[in-house]
Amino acid sequence: MRPNQRLYLQDILERILHIEFCTSGGRESFLNDRLLQDGVILAFMVIGEAVKRLDSQAIEGRPEVAWSDYAGFRDVLIHRYHDILLEEVWQFSQEDLAALKTAVTELLNDLENSDAPT
């Protein structure tokens, strides 16, 4: 893997945990709290940017994750910020984060194991 891959993976994992925290109060709480909304939106922006920087070899081995969806969602959030539908952000936060979290955790573990002395 290229340098900084661990940092990108750690960024993704940290942002997933942040999204989980911000959405733990439920849909209504999220939809009524601008601070929570902004936190989740920013976290998705970071996830999408970090996904774009990951080695294609690493993510191709994890087809259960729709990696390009995260990169594309980031682009929508950045370039069409005035059209953001909070219901879509909520749905995105509830649907596939578990698979992404699992894949990122496995990739980080793979890096740890490859760095371990033999």
Tell me what each language-model feature is.
Residues 1-118:
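Solvent-exposed interaction patches of small proteins and small membrane subunits
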